[in-house]
Structures are given as C-alpha cells and as structure tokens.
Amino acid sequence: METSSISTVEDKPPQHQVFINFRGADLRRRFVSHLVTALKLNNINVFIDDYEDRGQPLDVLLKRIEESKIVLAIFSGNYTESVWCVRELEKIKDCTDEGTLVAIPIFYKLEPSTVRDLKGKFGDRFRSMAKGDERKKKWKEAFNLIPNIMGIIIDKKSVESEKVNEIVKAVKTALTGIPPEGSHNAVVGALGNSDAGTSSGDKKHETFGNEQRLKDLEEKLDRDKYKGTRIIGVVGMPGIGKTTLLKELYKTWQGKFSRHALIDQIRVKSKHLELDRLPQMLLGELSKLNNPHVDNLKDPYSQLHERKVLVVLDDVSKREQIDALREILDWIKEGKEGSRVVIATSDMSLTNGLVDDTYMVQNLNHRDSLQLFHYHAFIDDQANPQKKDFMKLSEGFVHYARGHPLALKVLGGELNKKSMDHWNSKMKKLAQSPSPNIVSVFQVSYDELTTAQKDAFLDIACFRSQDKDYVESLLASSDLGSAEAMSAVKSLTDKFLINTCDGRVEMHDLLYKFSREVDLKASNQDGSRQRRLWLHQHIIKGGIINVLQNKMKAANVRGIFLDLSEVEDETSLDRDHFINMGNLRYLKFYNSHCPQECKTNNKINIPDKLKLPLKEVRCLHWLKFPLETLPNDFNPINLVDLKLPYSEMEQLWEGDKDTPCLRWVDLNHSSKLCSLSGLSKAEKLQRLNLEGCTTLKAFPHDMKKMKMLAFLNLKGCTSLESLPEMNLISLKTLTLSGCSTFKEFPLISDNIETLYLDGTAISQLPMNMEKLQRLVVLNMKDCKMLEEIPGRVGELKALQELILSDCLNLKIFPEIDISFLNILLLDGTAIEVMPQLPSVQYLCLSRNAKISCLPVGISQLSQLKWLDLKYCTSLTSVPEFPPNLQCLDAHGCSSLKTVSKPLARIMPTEQNHSTFIFTNCENLEQAAKEEITSYAQRKCQLLSYARKRHNGGLVSESLFSTCFPGCEVPSWFCHETVGSELEVKLLPHWHDKKLAGIALCAVVSCLDPQDQVSRLSVTCTFKVKDEDKSWVPYTCPVGSWTRHGGGKDKIELDHVFIGYTSCPHTIKCHEEGNSDECNPTEASLKFTVTGGTSENGKYKVLKCGLSLVYAKDKDKNSALETKYDMLIGKSFQETSEGVDGRVKKTKGKYVMPVEKNFQETTEGVDGRVKKKKKTRMDNGRPKKKQRSGRDDNQTRMQVELQEGNINSVIMHTVKNF
C-alpha cells in the first residue's frame, strides 16, 4: 500500500484483531504510532504496515480486512490520493454489509460531511484519482456509508492523546459485543454494527423477500411523516424473520441517529441475567460508556434527552422485560423529537398500550420462498446444472414450509449436497414427522405456555379451520370456563400460534405438524400426560386396542380422531374398551375422502352392548354409527357437538337426559330416525341438521323450548307433513326443501331471514306472512300446487330474492310494490304480465312459452344486470335494453325475429363487462344481426375509451362477447381470412400507448348437426413477432355458450362469435421491449373451438377476423392515427344508426366511417369514397391489387392524414359523397 496501513504477518491473525486504514507518512509517524502503542498496551492486536516503502500486495491486505474484527478508518486530507486506501475502504464496506466487521471511522481534521459528500479538495483528489475507473460508483457508495457510522472527530482543538484514549475505549466496547467464533449472540458495540456476529455467508440469503418487508416497516417509522418519537412493534410467529428484518433495519438506519443500540436475544439473556442488567446494557450502548454495567442510570439520561436515538429490542418475550426498560424508554419518548424504538416479539399482547403502530411480518411469497430454499439447498454450487432435476421436489419442500423462512433454511441446509434419493426419502419422512430443527424453534414458545394454554393449543390443532365460536365452546369446560376459553384463544392468537381469519381458527401447517409431534412424544413417554390419538397407525396398528386395554394409558387419552378412509382391515372393538377413558373429550370417526361422509364402508365393528360412559366428552362424531341408540350409560352432560350422519339410529337415547351444553346436532341421512324426544332438554341448541331423515314424521312439542335455535335443516324429510305451533325466536334459516308431503307452512318464527320451501306440497303461504320483516330469501321453486302469490309479499321490505321457478300453475304475479327485490326467478312459470321491478338485478324468464314480447319499460331498469330469456319460444322481438345489462341469454328463442335499434343504451363512461347470447335464434332477421354487430362495435369502442381513461387498461380480461346465427365476419373487422388461422403484418408503432384492446371474430360451423353439447367455447391464441423477438402466446376468450342447469343441446346453424378483450400482456411486452422502434410486426392468430375442457372436433372455424382498437387522442390529431384499425371517438356514441361504410350526419356533426387498415384498399375516383370491397386474404396475407391510374386523390388523402389534416379529409370526403 502506498504509505498506507497494515503489517506483514504470515501466521493467521489472532481473534479480535484491529485493522487500521489510513494515508500519509506524517500521520503514520505521529498519531497512528501513538494509537498502535495504546492499543497494544490494552492487549488489543493491531495490524499496521511497518514497511512503508514496499508495503504488502493488495490482495494480502484485503484478506487481512476479511480476517479482522474491527477496522479503524482514518480519513485525512490526503486520503483520496491513494487508490489502495479507497479499495480497502470498498472492502471494508462489503464486510460491514455482510455483518462480519465493525467499522469505526475517525475524521482527522476533516468534517464527516466533507468525506461523505466528497467536498472540497478531498473530493477533487478523489475525482482526479478515480477518473475513468469503472469502480468509481462502488467507491462513492463506500464513502457514503462508512462516514454515516458514528465515529470520532479530531479537529485542530483536540488533544490527540485524549482522542487516542477515546478510540481505545470505543474499540474495547465494540469488542465486548463481538461473540466468540461461531457464535451469533452479538450485542452491538458502542460504535459498532448490529450484524457484527453474523457470518459472511448469511447476508445473501437473508435478503430474499426482505426488501418489501423493510420498505413497509420503514413507512411506519418514516421520520419525515412522523416528527415525534415513535415506537413500533414488529410481530409475527416464531421463525418468520423478525430478527433478520431488524438487523437490516438497524444497519440501514443507525447512521441517521446520534445514539443507537440493538439488544438482541432478550428472551435468552433474560434467562441467564438479572432483569436489571437489561437497562444497564441498553444504557451502556446508548451512552457509549466503556463499561456497560452502569450503576447510576441518572447521569447519562440528559444525553438521551438531547439526542435523536434509535433503539432496537429483539425477541422480547415477557412483560417484565419491557417493564425493566420502561424508564429508559420513557426518557427517550420525552426527549428530542425524531427518536425511534422498535420492539420485536412473538407475543402481540406485549405491545398493547406501548407502541404507536405494529408491523406484522408475513410469510414469504412463493418466488422468494423458492429462492431462499434453493440458496441453502445449493449453497456450495448455485449454478448446479442438476438443479432443474430437483425443481419438482423443490416445489414440494417449498409447499411444505408454506413461506416460513426458518423452515426453508433448515430444509435447504439438510438437503445440501444430498442425492435425489435422499430428497425423496426426506419428503416421505416429513410426511410422518417434522424436522427436529424446525420443532426446536416452536418448542421454545410452547414451553412458555401455561398448562391450560398447552392443552388449548393441542386441542385447537384437532379442530383447525373451524368457527371460532365452535372452538371456544369445545374448550369451555368445568376446568376451563367460557371466559377462560376465550382468553386462551386470544392468548394463543397473540403469540401467533394460531390465527383467526373470517371467523375461523386457523393454524400454520408447520405448527399443526408440531402439535402432532408433541402428542407423539407424550405417547412415547410414561403415558401420564394427556394425549390425542389422530394418526391411523397410532390408533389401529397396535394403537387403540393397546391403549384401551391399558387402564393408565386409556385414562389419559384426551381425543381420538380416526380417518375411516385409511382403515384397510376389519377391526373389532370390545364392549368394554371405552370404560377406562374417563378423560376422553373428543371422539371422532370420520372420512376425509368424502366431505359429505356418505361413501364410507365402515370397517370398525361395534358390539351391540357397547359401553360408552364418556361423561367428559365434548365432541362425538361417528360416521355410520351402527347402533339404534346411544348406550344407556352415555352421559351427554358436557356434550357440545353431536354428529352421527348416515347412522342406523332410531332415537338418540332412551328417556330424558340433561344436555345443558349441547349446541350442535347433525343426524343427516339417518334414514331410520323417527323420534327426537332425546332433545327435549337441549335448550341451548343452535343448529339442528336432519336432512335426509326420511322416516321422521313429526317434531315433539317440547322443541318450542329451543329459544336459541338459529338453523333448522329438514331438507328431504319426505315423511314430514307439518310443524307444531311454536315460536323459535332465534330461528334465521329454515329449510324444508324436498319435503314432498309438507302441505301447510306455519309461521314458527318472526325472525326468519332465509326460507326454503322448494319442492313442498304447499298451495299457499300463511295469512300472517307480512310478519316476516327480516326475510331476505324466499325459495318456492317447484311448488307445483302453488297458484298465486299473496299481495302481502309486497309488505316484506327486506325481501331481496324471490324464486318461483317451475311453479307450473303460477300464471299471475300480483300488482304490488316490490321495489326492494334484486333477484326474481320466474323460469318455467306461466306468467304473461311482468310486475314493476325498478330495483331488480337478476331476472329469469326462461322456458316461458306465453311471453311474446317484453315491456318497453325494461330499458328503464337501470339496476338490471342479468336477463335470462332462454327457450322463450313465443318471443318475437325484444325492446331496447338498459345500459348496465351485463348478461343477456336468449338462447333457443326460436321465434325471435327483431331486436331494438339500438339494441341497448351505452353510457359514455361504459366499463361494464357484458355478454349477449343469441344462439339458436334461427329466425333472426338480417337487420337484427346487423344491429347486433353494430352494437358490438360501439361497445368495443366505448369500453376501450372508458377503461383507458379510468385504469389504463392494465387488467387483462374479456370485456364483451356476443354470438348469433350467421356466416360472415362483420365488415368493420380490419383483417379477416378463411379458416381458423390468421396472419397479418401490423404497421410500425402499432403497440403504442393508445392501443386499448383487440376485437376478435370467428364464424363457427357444426360438422354434425345432430351433436349435442352442454358448452361451446371459442378462444384465440394471439402471437406477435418482430425482427428480434418472439413472445409467449397469449390466449384470450372470444365467446362461449353454456347450457346451464344440466342437459345438452344442438347448435345446428353456423354462428358468429365476437369478443373484445384488453391485451396488456401483448402491449406490455412490446412497450417495454421496443416502443420507440419503427419496425413492422407480424401477428399470428389461431382460433379454437372447445366443448367443456377439450377441443371439439365436431366444430370448425370457417372464417376469422381481427381489429385492433385504439383510444383517440382528444387533444390533437396525430399523424400516427392513420395506422389505427379502429379509433375511439366521441362521435361513435352519437351515431344513431349502424355503421355500414358510409358517412352519416348525426346531431349536426359528420362522422368518419371506420376504415380498413392500409392493407385494405379503398376504391374511388376523384376523392370519392365508395363502399369498400374486402381484400380477401391468401394464407392470411392480402392479395396484391393492380394500382389504378386514378389513385392520386386516394394518395393525397393519405398524405393529409399523415400530416395530421384529418378535418380536411373528412370535409373532402363528405363533399364528394
């Protein structure tokens, strides 16, 4: 080094060495020599070049920096003259970034800002030295970072001997925070770095997914936005990456504060140190004291009051730790504005009342998860050529970790350098039990739980994804009451061991597997701990029989969860097997392969005289319970949930039994059930499911006591004829669907919100129907005896959905005010006159053979979005439709001839997606077809204009589609060909920012008129290619037809399918790739017809077409507009008649016709525009035409267009028209 630093040492330097980076012979002989002497007197090893003239090779010096623990970077006036000094500084920055080095800057007669901003002669020398060097940018970054670390300033007034002592103290303080080799327990030194104890290999992988996390956290800490002192909590489940995030934050922010400190591993430190040591450690760091064990905390507080402070507290686990630091935190809050405190914890409750805001660290997304896993799995060879062979397995491990960073690191590390066979073996082992290294992380949090919380955690694992109310009800018991159960759920939620989402209790997959591992360990110990049996091999294969026969083990079983789908062999239970299970709370025999639990072959044989003295049982689920009744010794005193679907039961139990806790009963499809007398005392019952209980004829009168019953399902109870008179005040949902002998419906609750009477034999609704003021849904589908709807329905002001489908005898709808109704289904009825429906959104009139026309007033239904007219075989015409209609289905309207002109109103701000279907409308007149195509064109134009204006067309989606009988591509399509494939050469700059979407057309023919389908879909694969690139194909929908409700139909005629879609994928790749280049582009389109999910060979695309749709520049007429296939202008919404290739006068303005692209020629003489002939395509390309000698006017018009004289062209055209 040119008069630079560092000594020659051949042996490996000892631990805790100091490297001095400096420039200048004068500095060496005086200040640096005194500093080296002082360091050595304090037993601190230091490296300095004693051989000024020859120095050391630079690579040796850089290696010494890597081996060092601390660097003293001494910035002096001549520092930037030396390339070696600056290259050393670059290396110092890299090492500090990696967390392997603590840097202490020393400003020798220079201001830190001079160094940081490269000012004055210091900066001039740097620019002169670095001129032309490609490393200049990295060097500037080093100068920007290192001086931002709090250092020591030596100015002209300083006493150098005192400053030397100050530097020695700072070095000693920093050394106390550096752990022994291999350890990661670093408490930051006074002038050090939070990552001092992080190995050099750790940095790279920790950045995966952390950039966005850091950005989000910094927004909550924003110093410009929040002027006062701010305390932020960083929370998340164990191993989620809180520590990594805090280290990144600390490293980025520490230079912005005059005092800063990170105290990590507070959970661990608190176990080995007295709590009063925590404030001593923190204050020592903040006060830059040589001895962090401060006895008098009052002395340095004034310093905190006067400075902006950054404090980072990591892994706080108990309130006492916060309380121990409270006094310092209060001083910081009351001190100078702008201080920041960050507290990381896995227990959110610790931050309550303490923090100003909370940042929750989320799981990594799939991309970052895969990167992190691959980094560790291939850490020694990131370019491993075989990595692609492991990709599928990698996906499996990433899926297993579910975005958990620590799990990804652990799994990747365990698989590093392992064969594919080992990877496969590891995956199979993980299916049985989690990695011990992952278990150990969660074990720390689990061990800190109380006994009640541990039981609650393990119980919840058995019922994850269930309703929160349900889980809390199961947990509530004599030893854990309702309040305690709620408290346990909240505590576990605060500790991120569970979470609640949409009212359900969820648990991360890793924690779920951990909970099972905890129970498995309990079974391998002395059996004294309560446990849950939930794996098939634990229960059947030498498990349950052994447990049930062992009195001590049986007494400690808390739950049995047996998936019957995994039982392969017949298994018999003895009548006495359950008598010793006095603590059993959860007994569940279920089938995971069938959610309806109806297809299980029960291979568990139960004796007739089974004993079941389960007094403590809360949850009893037994699929296909084989006995006629529960045993006499069964005691439901604590029973909360009873589920016995597809059972052989005739009644629950003999006689009356107390059921004070029973809230849920599900006996669905118990076809022999004939009595519900056992539920006479279930006064807290909330849900009762008796669907498919075909023998049940009546309800006991005692059911009127069920004042909390909110849900009653009697669907398919075909023997049920009536309900007793009662008032179930809490009942909200009543289902009587398919009760075919149920003739009279009594009003059993005024509070019903959803009432299903479909498929019943009722002929009329109750006289007091108006009492149902909360009724939202009334379903009377297929009530064939129903002849009229009472006028009292008009008084049901909350009613939103009325279903009268297939009420064959219903001919008249009452003249009532139903302005509140949103959904009205009248399909399959004989109603001829429509009611007033100002608010209806979904109207179904399909399969009505009586309706011949619709009321003209339907165009005023501004809320109407769906109109279903399928198979209205007498319908001959349709009026103008309202502007917000999104779906019109007129399939099979065989008498339909005409449509309104215009077909529907279009709003200037049109953004609605819409689909208009006229398939199998075989008598549709040509004028009607032309209006449909004209409407499609106007819809495309205005959709593009509105969406470009409102959201820039950033979302790729189908915006409009229609289909109708026909055999021609509409004339407004600019490119067309015969067949299913179209190739076009697009003009330069076709993909500029005005491109809003693409209009597509396909004429589809059925090769077999007798073929029947339930669905027909037309899609287009769009590919663009220029001179340099070929992009991935983009598939978009053109149109489709679906036979809803099952069944199939013929599509005999040829049909035209038109679709308009936004195309950001195509646009984006071109805009980003070559938006400024003037290159012609080829486009290739292939249209495909599918039936269901696969291509249908019985249908063929006869013709196809394409138009690109552009947004018109409203501020100016661009010369580029000459290339546009279709311009979007205000004039189009003003056109009252269809576009047929001529200019028409509309509201005092002239409208330019939609012209073809220049590859389609306009024939004319002397500037006159005639109806254009289509240029037919030969293999997707236009055939060449002989140029006429009378094309001068045509050419002149094109020149004027290119020069922007669009108005001249329009007037010239009109004049000659």
Swiss-Prot record:
Q: Which residues form the NB-ARC domain?
A: 211-472
Q: Report the coiled-coil segments.
A: none
Name the residues annotated as catalytic in the UniProt entry: E88
A Pfam family (short name) is: LRR_3
> Where in the cell does this protein reside?
Nucleus
- Domain remarks: The TIR domain mediates NAD(+) hydrolase (NADase) activity. Self-association of TIR domains is required for NADase activity.
Q: What is this protein called?
A: Inactive disease resistance protein RPS4
The uppermost taxa in this organism's lineage are: Eukaryota, Viridiplantae, Streptophyta, Embryophyta, Tracheophyta
**Gene name for this UniProt entry:** RPS4
